[in-house]
């Protein structure tokens, strides 16, 4: 049985089916929120990353969510506990970007794709990055 998790506001979240796993953690369906998924870290992230995730969730808005699968709520092992993951919108029906930018993949998947489509994709990617920058989520380190 998977553990019950809690949002920062105390809502219960129960992880469902595992959708994928990577080096940092795993992504699960959420039983209570069918349009969202939970990324749960294998080990709790450092305090600085926990703070960053809380800031990201607090500043999620329609403009960001139009472009990116963005953290909408932090997840905790207990009420008021450490951040061990986050909720984000469930994305389906999308292609990994390498299917567009890799010529070999593009020829397989989109054989009639022309430059106008590639420019359209590039413009959307640029808009995504601009939106993230406008929301203050990029730090310049010198």
Where are these regions (language model features)?
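ATP-binding glycine-rich phosphate-binding loop
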Residues: 1-49, 64-67
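Extracellular structured ligand-interaction cores
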Residues: 24, 35, 68, 83-85, ...
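Surface-exposed alpha-helical segments enriched in charged/polar residues
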Residues: 28, 54-58, 73, 127-130, ...
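A conserved alpha-helical element in kinase catalytic cores
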Residues: 42-80
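Conserved structural core of kinase catalytic domains
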Residues: 66-121
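Catalytic-loop of the protein kinase fold
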Residues: 122, 129-142
């Amino acid at each position: 049985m998977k553990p019950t998790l809690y949002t920062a506001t105390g809502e219960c979240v129960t992880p469902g089916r595992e959708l994928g796993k990577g080096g940092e953690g795993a992504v699960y369906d959420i039983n209570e929120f069918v349009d969202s998924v939970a990324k749960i870290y294998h080990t709790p992230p450092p305090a600085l990353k926990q703070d960053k995730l809380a800031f990201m969730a607090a500043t999620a808005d329609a403009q960001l969510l139009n472009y990116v699968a963005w953290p909408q709520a932090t997840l905790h092992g207990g009420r008021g506990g450490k951040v061990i993951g986050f909720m984000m919108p469930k994305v389906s029906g999308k292609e990994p970007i390498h299917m567009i930018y890799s010529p070999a993949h593009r020829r397989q998947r989109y054989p009639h794709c022309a430059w106008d489509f590639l420019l359209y994709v590039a413009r959307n990617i640029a808009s995504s990055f601009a939106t993230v920058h406008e929301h203050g989520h990029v730090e310049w380190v010198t």
